[in-house]
Design a protein with these regions (language model features):
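N-terminal hydrophobic/helix-forming segments and targeting peptides
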Residues: 1-172
Length: 172
């Protein structure tokens, strides 16, 4: 599982795939092969051999989120990157990467998370990244200025924590 765990630990949100791309290129070169990068960021490697050619392909990037706005209370309004529905994202632990490569952890949650103090009509609304789903940072921030002082601002990529578990030989 070692290398699989290494791969999952590399944040690779679509649009921020260079770290995993570099990792795969290094692995190919450590095996003694030369890698080539396509104009769209793909990696090719000729493993040699004779006979019919075989092509193996795989995605290196992953679905995630992006900071769309820093709310006045310091939470983050986000946009999906890829096909991540708000229902599936809710409760996920995340890593927010700043432009200068600092990383902060947080959690995706409802904007009004407390069911005992939220009006029924507000709580009943469908989940939507634009209106009622936010990322709360694991930092002592209370307003937009404090969040932005961390380097977290519009356009920062947000990766989901992979939560790797192996149970009875099954990967979760």
């Amino acid at each position: 599982m070692g290398q699989f765990e290494e791969l999952l630990a590399i944040d690779s949100t679509t649009g921020d795939f260079r770290p995993i791309q570099n990792y795969v290129k290094e692995q190919i070169e450590e095996m003694g092969y030369q890698s080539y990068e396509t104009h769209k960021g793909g990696i090719l490697a000729d493993l040699g051999g004779t006979g019919n050619s075989l092509v193996i392909t795989a995605h290196l990037d992953d679905i995630g989120l992006m900071v769309r706005f820093v709310n006045p209370d310091g939470t983050l309004r986000v946009a999906k990157v890829g096909g991540l529905s708000p229902e599936d994202a809710l409760g996920e632990n995340v890593r927010v990467k700043t432009r200068d490569d600092r990383v902060y952890t947080g959690t995706v949650q409802k904007k009004f998370a407390s069911v005992h103090v939220t009006e029924d009509d507000v709580a009943a609304k469908p989940l939507d990244y634009a209106t009622n789903v936010v990322v709360v940072l694991d930092e002592d921030v209370h307003n937009a200025e404090e969040t932005k002082a961390l380097g977290v601002d519009i356009g920062c990529f947000i990766a989901l924590e992979p939560r790797l578990q192996v149970c009875n030989g099954y990967i979760k």
